[in-house]
Amino acid sequence: MQQSLSALVLAAGKGTRMNSRKLKVLHEIAGLPLVCHVIEAIKPLQPDNIVVVIPSGHETIGDVVKPAAIKIQQNALGTGDAVKCGLADLKTLSGTVLVAFGADPMITTETLKKMIEAREIENPPDVVVLGFRTENPDRYGRLVLDDDGKLERIVEVSEADTID
């Protein structure tokens, strides 16, 4: 079993495509904000801590995600920067860091558990990434894999073309 598990929940996205003034993670499904569904899926994994990365100026999200800690991303510089921001609070920890998107309310504890278990093998991968195949990838970033199926790079949707 993994000795240490921490969770980062990325909740700093503005949700521009939703055409709403409300942050994407605060929209509700079944009476709960999206971000709360994600946190509820993480809790059964019993992480040492959960840190929710939020955008500057939206500190009230902290009330919604309690008792999870919050980390403010001062400048919205993308997903990678949000992870870097959240990891700053976890530098002294060892073990696995689970990174989840706060606007993915359908993620299940079982799926997250399988991702963690993928790191509990001999010679584990440094990174386990959850992705999906779609008929129409135009709206999504890309996970580019090498010939062995290993992650080569992640391409943001704004930088992707039909080759990626």
Question: Where are the model-predicted features located?
Answer:
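Glycine-centered loop/turn positions within well-structured domains
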Residues: 16, 24, 59, 126
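Extracytoplasmic/periplasmic beta-strand context in beta-sandwich domains
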Residues: 24-25, 141
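N-terminal nucleotide-binding beta1-loop-alpha1 segment
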Residues: 1-21
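Conserved core of the sugar-phosphate nucleotidyltransferase
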Residues: 66, 107-164
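Short glycine-enriched loop/turn motifs at secondary-structure junctions
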Residues: 20-21, 100, 164
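Short beta-strand/turn micro-motifs composed of small residues
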Residues: 11, 54, 101, 131-132
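Conserved N-terminal catalytic core of the sugar/cofactor nucleotidyltransferase
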Residues: 1-6, 28, 32-117, 122, ...
